[in-house]
């Protein structure tokens, strides 16, 4: 079974929720990919999409430098779904007009369904439905052959459809949870208009990728960067299933791990798997490279290049022809490393964009198409223990990006001790598995405090706890005050050098989950 035979292509115009669109489609067991809006029409044809979604974006379609996709996509004979900016672009390119709205719409809004065909098939037309609006422009004139499917108080054309072609458009964002009927609309597009089959499954993914890995590797050997996290553990299990003893896993202690983590990872894999595992202590090397470095991008690049250097060194020590390096790059890593205009990354990832041109090993990235929750699902399908599959994410650059500013032994010690307390209290109160991620961040400032009868001027630790489904978006977790209080009290009392603890209540977007 070809799990990629049917695919929904999403053209990205810069929306903060474009990845959510892809994820919602994947949840329906249909494959989806994100590409920049500037994807040439010939390339789009080669992808052979079953359907196309035009994402939202921050621009206005009438601006001189507004991003425009090739209007030829409407001649490909496949269904097209325009969302917010994508809807306005569709209307403009097909003969309608868009102008600045007299009243902008941001946040929750109510729409009334006027036509229950296509997107709104099966929905109750007798009542209004909550959706999420985010726009300052609106459609003024609709093209010939288009008709209104839904309206809101300030958007008479909240949803539109072509009378004879499979083109639909909405002014709101069906991909976000605040649009109560959003999933229904996407499902109607994917299965109703596009006639997709639900062929994107993890069992199918395993079968397809095991065969691909065998063919690519042949008789050569693979070295796998094993960190102990969910991603690298699943990578190791997948490749081991494909080539068995041709795989050697290397765990590198970069000196930036949490207390007892390196020892625990090595013990876990040696006791629970039959992977061939080599452990390398490179603490001094990495800490030396980070000395005096404060820029988070430079930190990530030093760490990424350092890992490659060590893996190449270890590859020379292994019996057999080592030609490949396996690592746990995920789809959000790839998407976030390039903006919708093909430049200006949100942040570089140590797995993406930090690889030197002179690297002598070819890459194998079997998870490159997957979102985080799909990786967990894959791990379960591969038979990995719950402990490996459901642990909270930990960044590849380790604690270096949870220390704002220079990484020093003293500052590492502070954030390590604080982190232990955070995780201990979250587990003790039964909250560890209720949240996506929970950790401590050491800030580059000191504040005045009083301990006993003495004035102090010491470090500040920030707590970061978030709820998420796939790390594409996240909200700060409403952790009960008593848990936060216990964490704060313990950190201030037990971690020397800290006199203040604050709680980060930022969502993603606009913030990222990690501080660097």
Swiss-Prot record:
It catalyses: XMP + L-glutamine + ATP + H2O = GMP + L-glutamate + AMP + diphosphate + 2 H(+). PROSITE patterns: GATASE_TYPE_1, GMPS_ATP_PPASE. ATP binds at residues 227-233. Its EC number is 6.3.5.2. Pathway: Purine metabolism; GMP biosynthesis; GMP from XMP (L-Gln route): step 1/1. The active site is at 84 (nucleophile), 173, 175. One of its GO terms (cellular component) is cytosol. Keywords: ATP-binding, Glutamine amidotransferase, GMP biosynthesis, Ligase, Nucleotide-binding, Purine biosynthesis. Residues 7-199 form the Glutamine amidotransferase type-1 domain. InterPro entries: Class_I_gatase-like, GATASE, GMP_synth_C, GMP_synth_GATase, GMP_synthase, GMPS_ATP_PPase_dom, Rossmann-like_a/b/a_fold. Residues 200-391 form the GMPS ATP-PPase domain. Transmembrane segments: none annotated. It comes from the Bacteria. One of its GO terms (molecular function) is ATP binding. Homodimer. PANTHER family: GMP SYNTHASE [GLUTAMINE-HYDROLYZING] (PTHR11922:SF2), GMP SYNTHASE-RELATED (PTHR11922). Catalyzes the synthesis of GMP from XMP. This is GMP synthase [glutamine-hydrolyzing].
